C-alpha cells in the first residue's frame, strides 16, 4: 500500500475515534478509573490526533538526495516488517494509538499486547481499525499475562521491532529477549520528575500546579512528583499546598468534580501504601495523607512527604501513586543537583519569571522533556523519551517512524545507466 493510501486510512480511523469518543471514554473509565471528563475531552481525542499526526508526517517525508564525487545518493525509508507494541495499564487507549500509529505509518504490521489490568479499549481500537479499512492481518491484538504472552512475542525471531512502555524491571527482560535476535527495542520506562519552584513565581499558580500532580491519583509517568521549592518560600508554599490538598475531592471517576480518582487495582494501592509505610519507618515526615481513604481498597489519600535525605526511597524510586516529596534549595546549582540526583530522566518542570534562570536551569536538567511555566503541553512532532532509567530511544514525529523503518542508502554511479 502506498504512503498516501495508509495516510487516508489513518485519517479515516481518526474520524472514527472522534465519532466514538463517548463509548471509548466509558470503557476506558470503567476499565482503569481515569476521570471520565478528562478522557472524553482530552485523552481520547488525543488518540485521534496521534493517527492524524503520523499520517501527515509520513506523507510529508521527503527522502534525502544528494550528489557526492561520482554518485547520486538517496536515503530510502522502508517498512521493517512486524512491530510488537506492549502498552501499560494507564491511559491504555491513548498510549496504544501513540505507539501503534508510527508503526502503521511506516508500513509495518502491528501486534498489540495491552496490559492485563486494562485490556478492554485495545479490543475496541481493533474494531475501529477494521472499520477504517486496514487490510486484514495488518493490525493484531494478543491479550494475556505479560510474563507469558509478552515473553513469547518479544523473543520471536520473526519480529522486527519491539516498542514498550512500562517499568524498568520489565524492560530489562524484554530487552534481553529482543537482543537474542538483535531486534531493535525502544522503551519508555517511567519517571521521577522534579518540579522546581523559584521564589519569584506567582505562588497561587505554582501551588495549583503542584497539587495538580495528584491528577489520576499520580498514575502518570510524566508527573512532577519531586517538589523542589526555594527555601525562602517553603513555609508559605507548604501552608497553601496543604490547604488546597485538603480541598481535593476523592470520588467517582464519573463525577466531574472529582479530583482524586480510584487507583487501577488493589494490588497497586498496596504497593503505594508500602512506600509510605517504609518512609515512616525511615524517619521521613508525612505532611498530609499517608493512608487509605476510609479503608477503601482503591482510593489513597493525596500524600506529601518531607524526606530525611535525598537518598530516601520515596525520593529515588517511582511510586506511581498520589505521593509527592518536598525538598528545598537555596541556589540554582543546588536545584539542578537535586533535579538530576535520581536514575530517572523523563521530564522536568520549573516555575520562574526570570528568563536567565529558565534558560540555565532548563538546559541543565537531564530529562527528555523540560517544561517552563507549563505542564503536559505536547507537540507530536517533537521527540519523546527519557534519559537514564526513563528509557531508551525516542518516539514522536520522524523519530517514531524511523524506529519502525529500515533506512537504505541507494547509490548510482554517474553516467552508468542508459534511459
Predicted regions and their residues:
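N-terminal Rossmann-like NAD(P)+-binding subdomain of aldehyde/semialdehyde dehydrogenases
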Residues: 1-71
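Residues at or immediately preceding the N-termini of alpha-helices
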Residues: 3, 21, 203, 234, ...
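Residue-level signal for inorganic ion chemistry
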Residues: 6, 28, 51, 107, ...
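Generic secondary-structure signature for well-ordered alpha-helical cores
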Residues: 15-22, 33, 37, 56, ...
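Rossmann-like NAD(P) dinucleotide-binding subdomain of oxidoreductase/dehydrogenase enzymes
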Residues: 18, 62-205, 329
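Hydrophobic packing residues within well-ordered alpha-helices of enzyme cores
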Residues: 51, 122-125, 153, 174, ...
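Conserved C-terminal structural/oligomerization subdomain of aldehyde/semialdehyde dehydrogenase
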Residues: 159, 196, 249, 276, ...
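ALDH superfamily catalytic-core signature
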Residues: 169-309, 372, 418-419
Amino acid at each position: 500500500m502506498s504512503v498516501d493510501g495508509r495516510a487516508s486510512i489513518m485519517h479515516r480511523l481518526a474520524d472514527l475515534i472522534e465519532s466514538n469518543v463517548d463509548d471509548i471514554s466509558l470503557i476506558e473509565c470503567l476499565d482503569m478509573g481515569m476521570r471520565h471528563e478528562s478522557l472524553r475531552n482530552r485523552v481520547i481525542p488525543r488518540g485521534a490526533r496521534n493517527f492524524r499526526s503520523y499520517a501527515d508526517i509520513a506523507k510529508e517525508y521527503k527522502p534525502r538526495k544528494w550528489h557526492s564525487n561520482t554518485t547520486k545518493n538517496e536515503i530510502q525509508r522502508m517498512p521493517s516488517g512486524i512491530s510488537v507494541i506492549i502498552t501499560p495499564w494507564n491511559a491504555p487507549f491513548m498510549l496504544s494509538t501513540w505507539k501503534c500509529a508510527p508503526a502503521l505509518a511506516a508500513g509495518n504490521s502491528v501486534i498489540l499486547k495491552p496490559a492485563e489490568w486494562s485490556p478492554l479499549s485495545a479490543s475496541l481500537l481493533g474494531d475501529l481499525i477494521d472499520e477504517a479499512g486496514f487490510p486484514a492481518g495488518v493490525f493484531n491484538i494478543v491479550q494475556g499475562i505479560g510474563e507469558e504472552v509478552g515473553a513469547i512475542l518479544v523473543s520471536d525471531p520473526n519480529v522486527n521491532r519491539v516498542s514498550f512502555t512500562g517499568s524498568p524491571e520489565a524492560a530489562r527482560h524484554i530487552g534481553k529477549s529482543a537482543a537474542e535476535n538483535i531486534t531493535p527495542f525502544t522503551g519508555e520506562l517511567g519517571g521521577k520528575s522534579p518540579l522546581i519552584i523559584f521564589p519569584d513565581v506567582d505562588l497561587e499558580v505554582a501551588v495549583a500546579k503542584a497539587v495538580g500532580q495528584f491528577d489520576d491519583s499520580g498514575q502518570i509517568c510524566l508527573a512532577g512528583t519531586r517538589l523542589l521549592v526555594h527555601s525562602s518560600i517553603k513555609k508559605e508554599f507548604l501552608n497553601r499546598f496543604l490547604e488546597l490538598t485538603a480541598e481535593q475531592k476523592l470520588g467517582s471517576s464519573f463525577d466531574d468534580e472529582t479530583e482524586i480518582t480510584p487507583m487501577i487495582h488493589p494490588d497497586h494501592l498496596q504497593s503505594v501504601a508500602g512506600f509510605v509505610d517504609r518512609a515512616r519507618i525511615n524517619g521521613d515526615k508525612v505532611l498530609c495523607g499517608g493512608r487509605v481513604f476510609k479503608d477503601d481498597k482503591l482510593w489513597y489519600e493525596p500524600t506529601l512527604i518531607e524526606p530525611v535525605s535525598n537518598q530516601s526511597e520515596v525520593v529515588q524510586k517511582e511510586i506511581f501513586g498520589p505521593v509527592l516529596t518536598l525538598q528545598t534549595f537555596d541556589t540554582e546549582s543546588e536545584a539542578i543537583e537535586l533535579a538530576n540526583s535520581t536514575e530517572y530522566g523523563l521530564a522536568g518542570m520549573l516555575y520562574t519569571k526570570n528568563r536567565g534562570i529558565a534558560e540555565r536551569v532548563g538546559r541543565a536538567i537531564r530529562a527528555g522533556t523540560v517544561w517552563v511555566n507549563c505542564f503536559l503541553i505536547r507537540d507530536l512532532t517533537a521527540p519523546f523519551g527519557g534519559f537514564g532509567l526513563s528509557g531508551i530511544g525516542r518516539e514522536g514525529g520522524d523519530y517514531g517512524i524511523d524506529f519502525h523503518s529500515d533506512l537504505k542508502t541507494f547509490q548510482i554511479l554517474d553516467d552508468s545507466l542508459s534511459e
